[in-house]
């Protein structure tokens, strides 16, 4: 509801790529946090956008445009800009599998959840940073 009505402006992830060893030290000594970056978009798209809870544009605003605006970050996709953007395959359906995460962190409560949407290309500063293979 807060995301839909604008009360919540930004969706951020806790990029906590801790190894299994760092997570298995007991509650008081374990590294806190879970992998969020690789799960966030496909989870939010599948469970908020597709059922109609929020429109796709609202998700893009909360995950990309609002953070850029709030932090005063440069970049855009106009001629002459050093573009930062990600191309998404919105039809890709799969189950989250921590073994396939590029992060060294594998801790997630969302393992095996069905999701939809996958990053297939990321451009940072006008250069390809990820092309689905690297």
Locations of the language-model features?
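His/Asp/Glu-enriched, well-ordered alpha-helical/loop segment
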Residues: 5, 10-11, 16-90
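C-terminal cap of metal-dependent C-N hydrolases
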Residues: 26-29, 79-134
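Aromatic-anchored helix/helix-loop segment that forms the rim or "lid"
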Residues: 1-2
